[in-house]
Amino acid sequence: MAAESDVLSEIEVLQSIYLDELNVTQNDEGGWTVSLVLHPSTAEDCLSQFVRLTLTMDLDSQYPYSSPYISIHNPRGLSDDKLLSLQKSLQMEAEECVGTPVLYQLIERAKEILTDSNIPHGNCVICLYDFKEGEVFTKTSCYHYFHSHCLGRYITHSEMELKDRERELEEDKTRDRTEEEELAVVCPVCRESLTYDLDALLSSPAPVLCQQEDAVIGGEFKKKWEALQKILERQKEKGGVIDPEAESNRFLIHINEAPVNLSDTPGMTDSSGAESSQSLPSSSPDSTSTTQTSQNQHTAGQPQRKHTGDFKRGRRGRGAGRGGPARHMVPAPGEERLGKHIQSSDKINSANSGPTNTTSQVESTAQRQACELSENTAQLRQPLTNEENKPVSQDMLTSEPKDGQEVSQQKECISKEVTQTILQEGHPEREHVGRGDKRGSRGSARHHGHWQDRNYKGPGHWDNSGSAGHRGGAYRTREGGAGRGHRGGGAYRGGGRGMHQRVEKEFRKEGVL
């Protein structure tokens, strides 16, 4: 009971000295907690007080025979090291005075340390530079310190933001008018409202910002940098480093890339290959003749596929099905002769396109081309005589051109006769098809030529009027009629004139006419 009365008497004395600054509470265990906000002793000059703290002393039920536990809260202007040393010194003094009242002695000791340390520690949180002697700084009501000029610039910027915020609130029609938001400039550290004189702050001199000298790179730093560089390279190789620029361009599509050549792409059709070969420019007569020869081969190959498809559809009796590649590819005789004549005409074109400087060169070139032409036509003379009984004119073959004009005339004559030969060759075939002999032999004597194949239907695939897509065929007709591509027994309406025009168009495309 005597110990408790001693504690109560000591607390009453402290309350009479520090008045309202002292805060005393009693806990459930019978102990007491005494706390006090301390400032430096500056003769009550609040503007000169740059540091402060809250000293808390916890007393147990055994006090004063046990030392109180001392803690510091809410420090301002003091560094961590300073606070740690202050707490240790007070705790040591309390342990030395065990058995006697020590609260007043601890409070005064802490106030003395604050007075000695009444210099703001740390740096200005606005400019991040330390405080130096001669610089003008300001202490706020929350005991935070700034250079006066830095604080003035901060307040100016904050006021501009507040005006923008007020304008936004006025334009906002959805906000509640009853709840007005209080806008004020706050401390950049603790967000407590500030009281300030803006003109006085801006008139203060700006702090001197020293330039940081270039650090001297030592050997240890270089070694460390090399080791880190190796780690960086290893991480890049394993994909551990993300490059923002490379990731942003990862799915970027470049439109300036060269187009893909269709002729180099596998799986393309023959027609696409022919179109790509036709689009390529030629730089010499040899390349021109080579390109034309490849085009002729593609052109000669396409009718063969069409002809074979017609045969398959004719065999089925219904032409609406899709025919695949034929099993037996038999070349047509007219197509072979046409390809040979086109090759001979291409050679004449290459001879005409060459430079002619003298008359002797022209004559020698023409004679050489005439000899080649006579050899080619000699090979074709026998089948043409047996099938058509109309051989090629000997006067035209034996005549020797004397200049480029005669060579071109000879080419035109040959082209016309080839056209007429193919036209005459197609008429008997069409007559045989038109009669519609339902049970006639496929190897009948009506076919001309000992090598005429049963699949060959003549040049009718050039005529659009007799399309092979109709139901029925040349060998099997539904009604026993004579129509080639029709179901009924009507006559075939495809005229020779239309076919002649069609053949001439094909020859003009190939460069014969």
UniProtKB/Swiss-Prot annotation:
Residue stretches of biased makeup (Low complexity): 271-297
Cellular component aspect of the GO annotation: cytoplasm; nucleus
Principal EC category: transferase
Pathway: Protein modification; protein ubiquitination
Subcellular location field: Cytoplasm
One GO BP annotation of this record: protein ubiquitination
Zinc finger (RING-type): 124-191
Pfam family, one: zf-RING_11
Polar residues: bias regions: 345-397, 406-423
Keywords assigned: Cytoplasm, Metal-binding, Transferase, Ubl conjugation pathway, Zinc, Zinc-finger
Start-end of Gly residues biased regions: 482-498
GO molecular function: ubiquitin protein ligase activity; zinc ion binding
SUPFAM superfamilies in the record: RING/U-box, UBC-like
Compositionally biased tracts (Basic and acidic residues): 426-440, 501-513
Binding site for Zn(2+) 2: C142, H144, C187, C190
Function comment: E3 ubiquitin-protein ligase that plays a key role in the RNF14-RNF25 translation quality control pathway, a pathway that takes place when a ribosome has stalled during translation, and which promotes ubiquitination and degradation of translation factors on stalled ribosomes. May also acts as a positive regulator of the Wnt signaling.
Similarity comment text for this entry: Belongs to the RNF25 family.
The protein's name: E3 ubiquitin-protein ligase RNF25
Organism: Danio rerio (Zebrafish)
Lineage of source species: Eukaryota, Metazoa, Chordata, Craniata, Vertebrata
